Amino acid sequence: MIRDLFKSVIGAKAEDLRRAAIISVLAAIACAIMPAAAMAQSAVNINLGTGAGLTERVVQLVGLMTVLSLAPSIVIMTTSFVRIVVVLGLLRTAIGVQQSPPNPVLISLALFLTAIVMAPTFERSYDAGIKPLLDQQMELPEAFEAASGPVKQFMLSQVDRDDLALFVRLSKIPQPRTAAETPLRVVTPAFMISELKRAFEIGFLLFIPFLVIDLVVASVLMSMGMMMLPPASISLPFKLIFFVLVDGWRLVAGSLVESFQRGAGG
């Protein structure tokens, strides 16, 4: 009797399981079909229009995507980032620590210092060109000229005149009457060359105290007959504590930002 009861219970449970499985499959199919239908009804439709203006809009879209992809390079080429990041890299080499601070830390610090230096320029650029473009008060070419004006003015305030004359000659364009009339494609490489030159000049000054420490440590080791000890390993702690005692990071960051302000003022 117990065996028959057990079989009946098992049979009932098996029947319930089959019924539940069928219901689950049907529910899964319904859940899969309903969102697909809803997505088909509310699919995003990108309408570029028809007629003669279609090609122009496609070209504008491609141009916008190109500018967005080149935005990091534009930031590097036309701002204070070049000088700052090169100086920070040379400082790390002068101290003698090749991997500390790591590259992401130096790049992040350079970006923040660049934002401080370029904030007034970016504000003028936004007010002159980007805001009128967003308010539909200017067309794109006119807005680009207006927005690039403050950036070009900043680069001209920092560029070396000999470097600017070099790229004017290399570009084979008519001699501009004033520096402000120089095309942006000529000002940008001249600005980058000038920034690299100034960064190397600052790097040279940063190397001198650490080089003196290396020479002193090497002389002491030689006088003590410790020829086998690498001077760089012995001098590294002294260079680190020297940099900390003189508050080196504050001096370097402050001097870098002030160097652009002096250049703009001059």
Swiss-Prot record:
Pfam family membership, one: FliP
Keywords: Bacterial flagellum, Bacterial flagellum biogenesis, Bacterial flagellum protein export, Cell membrane, Membrane, Protein transport, Transmembrane, Transmembrane helix, Transport, Virulence
Stored InterPro entries: FliP, T3SS_IM_P
Membrane topology: Multi-pass membrane protein
Cellular component terms (Gene Ontology): bacterial-type flagellum basal body; plasma membrane
Entry's transmembrane regions: 20-40, 58-78, 102-122, 202-222, 226-246
Gene Ontology biological-process annotations: bacterial-type flagellum organization; protein secretion
Subcellular location: Cell membrane; Bacterial flagellum basal body
UniProt-listed PANTHER family: FLAGELLAR BIOSYNTHETIC PROTEIN FLIP
Protein family: Belongs to the FliP/MopC/SpaP family.
Protein name: Flagellar biosynthetic protein FliP
Organism, as annotated: Caulobacter vibrioides (strain ATCC 19089 / CIP 103742 / CB 15) (Caulobacter crescentus)
Lineage of the species this protein comes from: Bacteria, Pseudomonadati, Pseudomonadota, Alphaproteobacteria, Caulobacterales
Gene: fliP
